[in-house]
Amino acid sequence: MRKILPLRAWLAAGLILGSPFSHAASNLVFCSEGSPAGFDPAQYTTGTDYDATSVTLFNRLVQFERGGTRAIPALAESWDIGDDGKTYTFHLRKGVKFHSTDYFKPTREFNADDVLFTFERMLDKNHPFRKAYPTEFPYFTDMGLDKNIARVEKLDEHRVKFTLNEVDAAFIQNLAMDVASIQSAEYAGQLLEAGKPQQINQKPIGTGPFILSRYQKDAQIRFKGNKDYWKPEDVKIDNLIFSINTDAAVRAQKLKAGECQITLNPRPADLKALQEAANLKVPSQPGFNLGYIAYNVTHKPFDQLEVRQALDMAVNKQAIIDAVYQGAGQLAVNGMPPTQWSYDETIKDAPFDPAKARELLKKAGVAEGTEITLWAMPVQRPYNPNAKLMAEMIQADWAKIGIKARIVSYEWGEYIKRAHAGEHDAMLFGWTGDNGDPDNWLATLYGCDSINGNNVSKWCDAAYDKLVKAAKRVSDQDKRSELYKQAQHILKEQVPITPIAHSTVYQPMNKSVHDFKISPFSRNAFYGVTNQP
């Protein structure tokens, strides 16, 4: 086993930024907040996973422009949509090379076979690779792509055709998402033949701007620039290092000390010092996000509407905004942010009313002192800068109405895994939009198809689901908006969640970092970025 030196050793050796004698402009250290659960992006749902995989190592047929929401050509140079809106023919880019590593040497360039493998593995539970390495693809399923993609066909080496069962107004946007990252069919075949298919999640091969070099869980991930990248002007960093630390205060100190050049999700308490540091800049933008409490409606007493209403109106949201977000948050009312088109501004929040909450609990037959669990995420997220404090404040609010909440936390990957399995009673959860479409909120987080994935409330309402699915099949945006607004009213009335806040996103970095663009989807992309002290 090769020894992985701690970050300080690399710094001392002058191999990373900080030494005037190193070729610093070609190296960059990112103070990351957590370890990825794995390196196969199709298996995961969080930004922590995607930063280390889909954004860095992989490409998709189409991708979102850096810092924006527009889907642009990537591994597909162009595409044609059939008159019925159900067929999409993609014309693939030629000359694209897969990563060459010590564990895989490609013998051919990217072609249609790779697209087929990528999607057939997710569509067909009897696919040979999936049978050898059984896994689930929760986000792919949450979006309903497993049901709506009827087939994927290879027309020739550089053309593939997707046929849908129903019109999907968000299909191109969905193909730009992380779960649609293109894998190497040749590499998968090699792993299958060797009896090691699980290595697709440990030793990744993509076509992206960086290549995985080394990984030490909870310590660092090292990438090297892909010199064979199909868009060479985007690879301006020779060595990209993710220095992992779950403590935001430590990340801030490392940034100020020059041990890393960029970080994410600073604590509100650290913002002023970061903004005043002479060597730093702290760009910001309104967050396309939502932090909320999810109630598991499959657990008693959360199956009763009166109980959910009571817990909702017992939470002092303004106090949370003041203490947790410290002025960098906006009170949330709906299940998506107000910057999302189709947001219904007519919907009002329930008033903060502990006395009425007690009455509702009594009506529901919930005894004084009833015990429940309240899960709190162990890491900072763009939508929740301090989950521990938020959970403690909610715990205190619920205690005032006779509910005893026991706070539970797990390592981030385990937290998500157990949430998908529905082990919680109530939990702090949140979302940053992934594609700019309302479906990414209203279906992915609250739809019936998502109850085994990101719908951690496990709430399935037939009337709501009918509206959301109908909206996806309509191309006219005004008509879609009307359907989505009706769905938002049902969501608010049924209270599977308590929306808490939309946060402002801050991205502290050294002034030496240039051309980094804050993503509306909270991705951290380092292609096209330079570091010039």
Swiss-Prot record:
GO-annotated biological processes: dipeptide transport; protein transport
Annotated signal sequence range: 1-24
DNA-binding among keywords: no
Cross-referenced InterPro entries: Peptide/Ni-bd, SBP_5, SBP_5_CS, SBP_5_dom
Pfam families listed in its UniProt record: SBP_bac_5 (PF00496)
Keywords for this protein: Peptide transport, Protein transport, Signal, Transport
GO molecular function: peptide transmembrane transporter activity
GO cellular component: ATP-binding cassette (ABC) transporter complex; outer membrane-bounded periplasmic space
CDD domains xrefs: PBP2_DppA_like (cd08493)
Key word Cell division present: no
Subunit structure: The complex is composed of two ATP-binding proteins (DppD and DppF), two transmembrane proteins (DppB and DppC) and a solute-binding protein (DppA3). Five orthologous SBPs (DppA1-A5) are present in P.aeruginosa, which increases the substrate specificity of the DppBCDF transporter.
Free-text function comment from the UniProt entry: Part of the ABC transporter DppABCDF involved in the uptake of various di/tripeptides. Prefers dipeptides with acidic residues at the C-terminal end. Involved in the uptake of phaseolotoxin, a toxic tripeptide inhibiting the enzyme ornithine carbamoyltransferase.
Family membership noted in the UniProt record: Belongs to the bacterial solute-binding protein 5 family.
Name recorded for this polypeptide: Di/tripeptide-binding protein 3
Native species: Pseudomonas aeruginosa (strain UCBPP-PA14)
Lineage summary: Bacteria, Pseudomonadati, Pseudomonadota, Gammaproteobacteria, Pseudomonadales
